[in-house]
Amino acid sequence: MSISESYAKEIKTAFRQFTDFPIEGEQFEDFLPIIGNPTLFQKLVHTFKTHLEEKFGKEKIDFIAGIEARGLLFGPSLALALGVGFVPIRRVGKLPGECASITFTKLDHEEIFEMQVEAIPFDSNVVVVDDVLATGGTAYAAGDLIRQVGAHILEYDFVLVLDSLHGEEKLSAPIFSILHS
């Protein structure tokens, strides 16, 4: 068993499940206990870092873009570990300055994401990170926002992919996930 496989098993045991959250009929996969455990959090970042260095090499990735809310929790640590920049993708009204925006539907309501226009230079290479890939709508919107400013998405990286929802079918770049369910 590789180190990454061993780490994935440890990470999986830390997830907590909440039934009927955020809406009735849904099961929420909570990865916050991982961040509360420094050893597991380091293993999470190490697993992503190792994967990205093996796949792309340090010179090819320019930015990690973290999707609000949970992508903002581990994205900066991953960017720091890789020695690249970090860019937050936030809900409307959370970022100062000129922002690009996109409106999308999530579950039963519309949301708007924004990103500062000057945060990612034209032609940059970006990896998008978030905790869970479900239907793919949130990740798709984040990717569309990054493409609006002329950057390239190398990959979408997730802690967990809910395979039964086929979210990867909406995405135009490869995905990587530590766990699948």
Curated annotation (Swiss-Prot):
Residues modified as N-acetylserine: S2
Q: Which family does it belong to?
A: Belongs to the purine/pyrimidine phosphoribosyltransferase family.
State which Enzyme Commission number(s) the record gives.
2.4.2.7
- Subcellular locations according to the entry: Cytoplasm
Q: What else is known?
A: Present with 937 molecules/cell in log phase SD medium.
Q: What is its main location?
A: cytoplasm
Q: Which reaction does it catalyse?
A: AMP + diphosphate = 5-phospho-alpha-D-ribose 1-diphosphate + adenine
The role this protein plays is: Catalyzes a salvage reaction resulting in the formation of AMP, that is energically less costly than de novo synthesis. May lack catalytic activity.
Single GO molecular function: adenine phosphoribosyltransferase activity
The GO annotation for biological process reads: adenine salvage; AMP salvage; purine ribonucleoside salvage
Q: Which UniProt keywords apply?
A: Acetylation, Cytoplasm, Glycosyltransferase, Purine salvage, Transferase
Q: Where are the transmembrane segments?
A: none
Query: What NCBIfam families does UniProt report for this protein, alphabetically?
Result: PRK02304.1-5
Entry keyword Membrane: no
Broad class of enzyme this protein falls into: transferase
This protein's superkingdom?
Eukaryota
Residues in a coiled coil are none
Q: What is this protein called?
A: Adenine phosphoribosyltransferase 2
Q: Which GO terms describe its cellular component?
A: cytoplasm
Q: In which pathway does it act?
A: Purine metabolism; AMP biosynthesis via salvage pathway; AMP from adenine: step 1/1
